């Protein structure tokens, strides 16, 4: 039987800023505490975005020690020296239980996949974060794949592992730069600005009752 061309057969989820609170909140706090201009850290990461220290770290080309020095040099060139180790300490946010319940609801109806740019494989970090892996049929981590969002190879591999055509997938991410190439491939995309709004959009696309999943207030982000 031919597949329904409009059917959603996989839901792809980003980690930071989607399933957890955004590390950008921790970045902003760090900048305030040290008198840096707002958005300084993101600005460093946005300079030469395909080959800077951050990109090479996420592809597994730099270890944390070499990243520490490389990011310090790049940030110094931008006006303020920030050790890369300081940035790494800001990456882990707090889990959003309501989003994880939505993942579980989707998994009853489709393949669920986690698509994350990371430094350390999730099974090597905090137990609470590592436990997230059990919610997904497919896990794609830049630290293990040698490619990262928004590189097309990352998305092609994710769809192949989920055994879906891009047109059969919905992808949730908090960064437009990551969503743009996925949308160009044919995926339906949702930019996550708030969990509630994102789940409303997901429910509208799929027709599934994910928006009814009880959302809980988030705890403050920790560093």
Q: Each PLM stretch: what is its role?
A:
Residues 1-9, 13, 119-120, 124-223:
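Asp-based, Mg2+/Mn2+-dependent phosphohydrolase catalytic module
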Residues 3-100, 119:
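N-terminal helical cap/lid subdomain that shapes the substrate entry/recognition surface
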Residues 14-17, 60, 106, 114, ...:
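Generic structural signal for small/hydrophobic residues in well-ordered secondary structure
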Residues 30-31, 71, 106, 158, ...:
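Broad structural signal for hydrophobic residues in well-ordered alpha-helices, predominantly aliphatic
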Residues 74, 102-105, 161:
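A generic secondary-structure signal
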Residues 98-109, 135:
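Catalytic-core regions built around general acid/base machinery
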Residues 111-112, 188:
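Residue-level detector of anion-binding/catalytic polar loops
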């Amino acid at each position: 039987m031919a597949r329904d061309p409009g059917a959603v057969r996989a839901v792809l989820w980003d980690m930071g800023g989607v399933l957890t609170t955004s590390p950008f909140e921790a970045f902003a706090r760090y900048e305030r505490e040290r008198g840096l201009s707002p958005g300084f850290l993101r600005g460093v990461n946005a300079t030469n975005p395909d080959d800077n220290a951050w990109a090479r770290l996420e592809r597994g080309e730099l270890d944390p020690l070499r990243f520490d020095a490389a990011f310090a040099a790049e940030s110094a060139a931008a006006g303020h020296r920030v050790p890369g180790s300081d940035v790494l300490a800001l990456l882990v946010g707090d889990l959003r239980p309501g989003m994880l319940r939505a993942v579980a609801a989707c998994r009853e109806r489709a393949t669920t996949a986690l698509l994350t740019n990371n430094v350390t494989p999730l099974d090597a970090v905090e137990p609470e974060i590592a436990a997230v892996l059990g919610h997904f049929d497919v896990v794609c981590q830049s630290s293990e794949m040698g490619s990262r969002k928004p590189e097309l190879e990352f998305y092609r591999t994710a769809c192949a592992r989920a055994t879906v055509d891009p047109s059969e997938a919905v992808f949730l991410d908090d960064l437009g730069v990551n969503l743009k190439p996925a949308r160009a491939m044919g995926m339906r995309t949702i930019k996550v600005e708030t969990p509630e709004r994102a789940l409303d959009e997901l429910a509208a696309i799929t027709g599934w009752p994910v928006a009814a999943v009880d959302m809980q207030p988030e705890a403050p982000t920790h560093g």
